[in-house]
Amino acid sequence: MVEWITSDAPVPYPLAVAEMEARANAIAKGEAGEAVWLLEHPPLYTAGTSARESDLRDPDRFPVFETRRGGQYTYHGPGQRVAYVMLDLNTRGKDVRAFVQRLEAWVIAALDDFNVTGAVREGRVGVWVDRPEKAPLPDGTPREDKIAAIGVRLRKWVSFHGLSINVEPDLSHFDGIVPCGIEGHGVTSLVDLGLPVTMADLDVALKRQFFEVFGA
């Protein structure tokens, strides 16, 4: 059975990484069960294994942490729900691509509870929403904003790190980076989309939809 852990106060990033790694190691050894940890961080940027230095536009704005998860630069901060997912893929299937797709499907299903249509895009990991009310890009491409980021790491086929969904963060904090290395498109949140969703509301949706996507 998956243990659900929720932290009410913002968790410092180094502490979260240490806790995740310890839990993942314990799962791999058969000494602990799987877990999903719901939390928020103080304002910070993280750099994944594919991060480009040029995508860090304002290195002095918030602390920057190098991390060994997949992906590029992302922002974490208050008003953003982070879900660290520590699952044993030895029993759930040793397929990294399928695992990431299930994380995306989980986010999309949770957003659907609030009548938000999330979508994935080829070559752009994460979940996006159409913004037809915004002017298209100069080449005519319709505007889309990112509402959720995904970046995971596996050790002995146990996952850690996970995903983040924007509920009501300060979206200007994303200006210090090129989020996930993708130029042109922006970021949004549930509240930015005009929905009075709370963190507790999202947590209920995440828990319900997790079992639909991943099972027990």
From Swiss-Prot:
SUPFAM superfamilies: Class II aaRS and biotin synthetases (SSF55681). GO terms for biological process: protein modification process. Substrate binds at residues 69-76, 149-151, 162-164. The active site is at 180 (acyl-thioester intermediate). Keywords: Acyltransferase, Cytoplasm, Transferase. It catalyses: octanoyl-[ACP] + L-lysyl-[protein] = N(6)-octanoyl-L-lysyl-[protein] + holo-[ACP] + H(+). The keyword Cytoplasm applies. It is found in: Cytoplasm. Pathway: Protein modification; protein lipoylation via endogenous pathway; protein N(6)-(lipoyl)lysine from octanoyl-[acyl-carrier-protein]: step 1/2. One of its GO terms (cellular component) is cytoplasm. The record marks 146 as: Lowers pKa of active site Cys. Its EC number is 2.3.1.181. Its main location: cytoplasm. Residues 30-216 form the BPL/LPL catalytic domain. GO terms for molecular function: lipoyl(octanoyl) transferase activity. Catalyzes the transfer of endogenously produced octanoic acid from octanoyl-acyl-carrier-protein onto the lipoyl domains of lipoate-dependent enzymes. Lipoyl-ACP can also act as a substrate although octanoyl-ACP is likely to be the physiological substrate. PANTHER family: LIPOYLTRANSFERASE 2, MITOCHONDRIAL-RELATED, OCTANOYLTRANSFERASE. In the reaction, the free carboxyl group of octanoic acid is attached via an amide linkage to the epsilon-amino group of a specific lysine residue of lipoyl domains of lipoate-dependent enzymes. Belongs to the LipB family. NCBIfam families: lipB, PRK14341.1, PRK14345.1. This is Octanoyltransferase. It comes from Jannaschia sp. (strain CCS1). The lineage of its organism: Bacteria, Pseudomonadati, Pseudomonadota, Alphaproteobacteria, Rhodobacterales.
